[in-house]
Design a protein with these regions (language model features):
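Cytochrome P450
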Residues: 1-202
Length: 202
């Protein structure tokens, strides 16, 4: 329908995808649907996982929770750091476009590889103690939203949504705590976050 609408189609990301060319040809319908599905599912799944991860992390750390209530300007850095420690997206698959060496391992062009973002964001050579929460880390080292040509196109929106959710949650509560006797149940790979999380909010 959008292609048929021509110049009457709304000027949005989907319409721009329909005009996008790769190697001199327009993307076909299957490619456009795949991209839009990845954007949508990636957004919904990772945002919901992220909110659970953030709430759980703060429920376990009342001092940090209170600090962020009193200094909401710290939230953007705190959110990125918490999600570096507990990644909402564990891994992604890629196909190498050229031969590359990673560590001492040779990988030929055209190989299928799995990138473990959660592991990269806990690399001791970059982050020292990867479990230590620090607001002064170099944000360019954090691969929460990927990097290069595969950087998440929704990163600015995701950051905005997470900041607003946490601002509102902290502004309208004075305590977020775990429910005694109801331990959280972690999601099963390839998902992240929690499949069940009980919190008491006052």
């Amino acid at each position: 329908m959008r292609r048929e609408a021509g110049s009457e189609a709304p000027d949005d990301n989907t319409t721009r995808l329909l005009r996008e060319q790769v190697g001199g040809r327009l993307l076909n319908e299957e490619e456009v649907v795949s991209i839009v599905r990845n954007w949508t599912v990636g957004e919904l799944g990772t945002i919901s996982a992220s909110v659970g991860i953030l709430a759980h992390y703060l429920a376990e750390r009342p001092e940090l929770q209170q600090q962020l209530r009193e200094q909401p300007s710290l939230l953007p850095a705190a959110i990125d750091e918490i999600l570096r420690i507990h990644a909402p997206l564990i891994a992604n698959r890629r196909i190498t476009t050229k031969a590359v060496e990673v560590g001492s391992r040779q990988i030929a062009a055209g190989e299928r590889v799995t990138l473990i973002w959660a592991s990269a964001n806990r690399d001791e050579t970059l982050f020292g103690d990867p479990d230590e929460f620090r607001l002064d880390r170099d944000p360019s080292q954090n691969l929460l939203y990927g990097a290069g040509i595969h950087v998440c196109p929704g990163a600015p929106l995701a950051r905005l949504e997470l900041r607003v959710v946490m601002e509102e949650l902290l502004a309208h509560t004075h305590e977020i705590a775990l429910v005694p006797g109801k331990p959280p149940i972690k999601a099963i790979y390839p998902a992240s976050g929690f499949s069940s999380l009980s919190l008491r909010v006052h």
